[in-house]
Amino acid sequence: MKGAQRLCDKGRVLDSSGVVLAKNSVANGEIFLIDYKCEPKGARAIFECEEFAVFDKPSGVLSHPNGRHCKYSLYDEIWSLYGRSAAVVHRLDKETSGVILVAKNLASLNALKMLFENRAVKKSYFALVSGRVERDFVIDEPIGESLETDEVAIKMRICENGKKAITEIYPIEYFSEFNATLVRAVPLTGRQHQIRLHLFHVKHKILGDPLYGTDTATFEAILDEKLSVCERINLTGASRLCLHAANLHFEFNGKIYDINTKSDFKAEFLKSLGI
């Protein structure tokens, strides 16, 4: 019964009246179930063992399908490779690229999720940010949901009564020709949009960020893919969010795993600037 309700909640059950959403409702006439058909594009794991795999997700790919009209997500790959018991353990935003952990079965999924909940997984990212970052520093600012009614629902904000959030920032390389710095960001907590919001808060916005540093109309235009590449670059600094998940470090079943990206993220960042 729970499975049937989940299908209704996702809008995958239709009758002659349309999509069946209401709980305990009686469907009329013929019943249609929308099943999820995998259409893989050939992505392969950069690391795998019996319990899990790690993929290098490209920017622009959803970690998880977001509705009936989703044409492609990482699940097209993982379900075609490992079956429908496989699932992503944590999510990366659509425009964030990099390493993402995939459990091959429910037992592994629950165990790996517990590692994230207990902050036993160390993560590091690379980001291309505006301005010159000259020294290492730590951003310790609490994060909460935005209370502004005219703002995008997913937008977060720095607020005194928010959840504790700490990010370490390390400058790697400065590019004087476009006044931007490649930094390594290490989140010590796991808040939504933590790295993006923290860097925006200290005046080092991640280039290409469609949400922080833009207004609602611009964000929606980017989300709906209504802007040209040049327009996107002019408004946000890059044609994509220049944020890449580079490393996962954790212990699982008595073994220590240190998994690094294999993508040339620096070249991809620079290409997205349109230079």
Q: Across the structure, where does each feature detected by a protein language model lie?
A:
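RNA pseudouridine synthases
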Residues: 1-151, 163-164, 173-174, 264-274
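Short histidine-centered loop motifs in beta-beta connectors
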Residues: 183-186
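Long C-terminal interaction/binding lobes of large macromolecular proteins
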Residues: 169
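Short solvent-exposed strand/turn elements
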Residues: 188-191, 264-265
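A generic structural signal for residues embedded in beta-strands
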Residues: 33-35, 195, 259
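Short beta-strand micro-motifs in enzyme catalytic cores
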Residues: 53, 125, 179-181, 246
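Short beta-strand segments enriched for Tyr within beta-sheet-rich domains
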Residues: 112, 191-199
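Pseudouridine synthases involved in rRNA/tRNA modification
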Residues: 1-6, 177-178, 198-275
